[in-house]
Amino acid sequence: MKPKIKYDLVDMLKYRRKHGTESIKDFCEKYLHPVFGYPDVDDNYELIIGKDPKICFAAHYDTVHTMDGMQELEISNSTVTLAKGSKSNCLGADCATGVWLILEMIHAGIEGVYMVHANEEKGCIGSKALVKHNPRWLDHCQVVISFDRMYQNSIITHQSGIRTCSDNFANSLSDILGMGHM
């Protein structure tokens, strides 16, 4: 039986992960390199678990922070927020949670193609580069589930003006998750 690795979501949220900064490099060294190895030429991380996985799980590791470094957080009633007086412009919870979920799924041995993209907040640069350099990278996958979100109760159907799923899929998923119709 493999030991339980506990990835620390709160610690992950402390990193301001603006693309190209020291704090994003530190984040990758601490959380992504030990699991994925080093990234491809476009700074994307990929790992395949299983013989013929049909599902791809995706997230991105950059944030819309405007500065480098660490941020202080407060935890109250199981809710994490920026500390009072914080100079940060965002918490960065959607992408940190996506990376955390992917790390936990990999550790649990869940079969799939795992992709963690770079520089998505600046116009999907990491995912576009992946498709440009390897247009057939997903041919064997039937489904892509991207752990990204907007606000607290949303299913994203478009990103950068590009449809990411049908309204029928979004409404069905919304019903399954108990969110009501979109």
Feature map (PLM): residue ranges:
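N-terminal, Lys/Arg- and Ser/Thr-rich interaction peptides
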Residues: 1-11
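A non-catalytic alpha/beta surface segment that caps or lines the substrate-entry region
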Residues: 11-53
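Intrinsic-disorder/low-complexity, polar/charged segments
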Residues: 18-21, 62, 167
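Short secondary-structure junctions
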Residues: 33-42, 77, 175-181
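General beta-strand structural signal in soluble alpha/beta enzymes
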Residues: 39-42, 57-59, 82-84, 114-116, ...
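Intrinsic disorder/low-complexity detector
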Residues: 42-48, 54, 64, 96, ...
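Active-site metal-coordination/substrate-binding segment of hydrolases
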Residues: 51-111, 122-123
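Acidic/histidine-rich catalytic neighborhood of metal-dependent amide-processing enzymes
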Residues: 87-91, 95-182
